[in-house]
């Protein structure tokens, strides 16, 4: 009986000391480290979308079709840049001013679905015809880079991290770059 009480007491003490998990506002500024954060994602994606939507491509009556390539990670750290790409795509799509075509990464899936609908199990009047994919007007591409600096003095270390997101929009028909912008973020620690 005493062993059981001891085990229960230790278990209660162990679990009562565990950290509590709380939900927080995803738009709240995150300053836990100088590494890439959710705040950085929100800042750079919104800045790029705002800039692109003020460009000449959205000043006419037609909604241009854009294919977006995944942002390339040229930093020294692992950053899943698909979250940057997805955030920019969602914000642009929600603006209602542009449309998105099938990019190279999604093309195989799109072709497979069209091919699947061409068999005898589908009503030919309700199936998608081959050769009807819309071609894109523009291609959006870019990269994320970082520069890391560390300065050590006696018992103190100061770290500086600089991020730059660069995006370019290319007219597919002419091969001309029609828009480009960059967003910088600098963080220091120590």
Predicted regions and their residues:
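N-terminal segment of the mature soluble domain
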Residues: 51-122, 132, 172, 176-179
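Sec-dependent signal peptide recognition
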Residues: 2-8
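N-terminal secretory signal peptides
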Residues: 32-60
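Soluble non-cytosolic domains of exported or imported proteins
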Residues: 35-43, 78-83, 121, 160
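A short, hydrophobic beta-strand-centered structural micro-motif
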Residues: 47-48, 52, 66-70, 121-152
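Bacterial Sec signal peptide processing site at the extreme N-terminus
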Residues: 11-35, 190
